[in-house]
């Protein structure tokens, strides 16, 4: 999926409002995913998955950092996320559907925290962005 100039602008503006909260939002999205889609917990058997867990917060920071990296490289997402794609495809072997589930939870989290900025256009742009990130992360599965 190709991001238009407007999409890129919307994504950068929305992520700019996330600011230093990317890790917290990532952790919240993970918690939403674990609650809404319990089968996703199987990829984290060694984690304490309770609310506020240090392990979920640490992984949420990784998610937030990866998305911040992606926002900074909207014109070269495959290059920016290549190592992460390798990790998830070859070492962790995460089922690709889980990226869609996490994307849904990220959109919900952003909508809750940025209600005035989460317009239909921004929602659509963020959805396209997260879909593109998911596609890049699963590209090495083939």
Swiss-Prot record:
What quaternary structure, including any partners, is listed in this protein's UniProt entry?
A: Heterotetramer of two alpha chains and two beta chains.
Q: Which cysteines form disulfides?
A: none
Set out the biological process GO terms recorded for this chain's protein.
hydrogen peroxide catabolic process
Q: Which InterPro entries match?
A: Globin, Globin-like_sf, Globin/Proto, Hemoglobin_a-typ, Hemoglobin_oxygen_transport, Hemoglobin_pi
Q: What does this protein do?
A: Involved in oxygen transport from the lung to the various peripheral tissues.
Q: One GO MF term, please?
A: iron ion binding
Q: Where is the Globin domain?
A: 2-142
Listed binding positions for O2 are 59
Is Protein transport one of the keywords? no
Q: Which UniProt keywords apply?
A: Heme, Iron, Metal-binding, Oxygen transport, Transport
Q: Which organism is it from?
A: Equus quagga burchellii (Burchell's zebra)
Gene3D superfamilies, from UniProt? Globins
A GO cellular component term found in this entry reads: haptoglobin-hemoglobin complex
What is this protein's name? Hemoglobin subunit alpha-1
- Which PANTHER family does this entry report, sorted A to Z? HEMOGLOBIN FAMILY MEMBER, HEMOGLOBIN SUBUNIT ALPHA
Q: What taxonomic lineage is listed for the species of origin? A: Eukaryota, Metazoa, Chordata, Craniata, Vertebrata
Which residues bind heme b per the record? 88
Q: What does the sequence similarity comment in the record state about its family? A: Belongs to the globin family.
């Amino acid at each position: 999926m190709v991001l238009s100039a407007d999409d890129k602008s919307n994504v950068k503006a929305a992520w700019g409002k996330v600011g230093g909260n990317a890790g917290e939002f990532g952790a919240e999205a993970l918690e939403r995913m674990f609650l809404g889609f319990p089968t996703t917990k199987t990829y984290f058997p060694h984690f304490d998955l309770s609310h506020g867990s240090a392990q979920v917060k640490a992984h949420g920071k990784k998610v937030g950092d990866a998305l911040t990296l992606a926002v900074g490289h909207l014109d070269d997402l495959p290059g920016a996320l290549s190592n992460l794609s390798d990790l998830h495809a070859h070492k962790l072997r995460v089922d690709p559907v889980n990226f869609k589930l996490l994307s849904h939870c990220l959109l919900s989290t952003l909508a809750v925290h940025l209600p005035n900025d989460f317009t239909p256009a921004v929602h659509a742009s963020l959805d396209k962005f997260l879909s593109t990130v998911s596609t890049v992360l699963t590209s090495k599965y083939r």
